[in-house]
Amino acid sequence: MMSKNYHIAVLPGDGIGPEVMTQALKVLDAVRNRFAMRITTSHYDVGGAAIDNHGQPLPPATVEGCEQADAVLFGSVGGPKWEHLPPDQQPERGALLPLRKHFKLFSNLRPAKLYQGLEAFCPLRADIAANGFDILCVRELTGGIYFGQPKGREGSGQYEKAFDTEVYHRFEIERIARIAFESARKRRHKVTSIDKANVLQSSILWREIVNEIATEYPDVELAHMYIDNATMQLIKDPSQFDVLLCSNLFGDILSDECAMITGSMGMLPSASLNEQGFGLYEPAGGSAPDIAGKNIANPIAQILSLALLLRYSLDADDAASAIERAINRALEEGIRTGDLARGAAAVSTDEMGDIIARYVAEGV
């Protein structure tokens, strides 16, 4: 299919990270063989595993390894073992946030899909769940109220106050809007931009610039929606949405709402990208230390993270689609890990990985 050589930095991390990563790498093997792709991998410690082995959550060797790669496949970090450490030395804040900053990962892509056969897990009304949904939440990661200056606290007594500042620059809005429109072209050609342009100056600028960028994509339909209405519409009829384009704060809220209405966090991948197309790909859920090592974790979010990596960093859409079809097939056949079994027979983490890898190899 392609002759280029690719290299992936693999960071399994903690908890269920290593065992679900093993399944993703089985699937990668199947992709390599079926599509004749030349992809190599190198493993590096991160999070708690790196603290145990190197005394810090993000060793220089790990950062260096990621710099030499085309993309990073990340597992999960954290657990009770390291909770006594100062916050910036704990696995989550000491590894993931510095990686995002170092590689200037400004866009976060969170797909949320209700798979056929899993409607019973959706907390929405049955008639709404029956319509299904397949949403991609595109969130700006480095601007907005989380990073704007000034921020702080001052004064005392009745006059004590705290303040944060929502700041967006034109270039930040333009580049995240382009990610959303490009993503929509690979999907159902619709972008819904979320703002609060009836109140906020930053949202007024956001809407103006998104309208400008939309003229570059005449094949993509654009709609605008206020954040308060969007949270309601996601509950009322999520099937109306394709790509949601959001600022940092609004995307933080909506991507979690999208995840929740699928009813299955173990199924949701996440991608964080920079302007060069370099990305860090990880499951949206946590390290689940309570089930680590028991061979019962759901590896699908990690495997779907690999699919996103293939699509967005390696431009291998065929391979990504093959993985997604294999997962659909497994779920349609009633194959479930324990989190989705509901009394039915459950397969192990290893078995689920084997089945999906086999289906990729067979070209289902």
Swiss-Prot record:
Keyword field: Amino-acid biosynthesis, Branched-chain amino acid biosynthesis, Cytoplasm, Leucine biosynthesis, Magnesium, Manganese, Metal-binding, NAD, Oxidoreductase
Stored SMART domains: Iso_dh (SM01329)
Catalyzed reaction equations: (2R,3S)-3-isopropylmalate + NAD(+) = 4-methyl-2-oxopentanoate + CO2 + NADH
Pathway annotation: Amino-acid biosynthesis; L-leucine biosynthesis; L-leucine from 3-methyl-2-oxobutanoate: step 3/4
Location(s), subcellular: Cytoplasm
UniProt entry tagged with the keyword Zinc-finger: no
Record: residues binding NAD(+): 79-92, 286-298
Domain of life: Bacteria
Annotated positions binding substrate: 100, 110, 139, 228
One GO term describing the cellular component: cytosol
Coiled coil residues, start to end: none
EC number: 1.1.1.85
Details of cofactor binding: Binds 1 Mg(2+) or Mn(2+) ion per subunit.
UniProt record similarity statement: Belongs to the isocitrate and isopropylmalate dehydrogenases family. LeuB type 1 subfamily.
Record function comment: Catalyzes the oxidation of 3-carboxy-2-hydroxy-4-methylpentanoate (3-isopropylmalate) to 3-carboxy-4-methyl-2-oxopentanoate. The product decarboxylates to 4-methyl-2 oxopentanoate.
Subunit note: Homodimer.
Name of this chain's protein: 3-isopropylmalate dehydrogenase
Organism for this UniProt entry: Escherichia coli (strain UTI89 / UPEC)
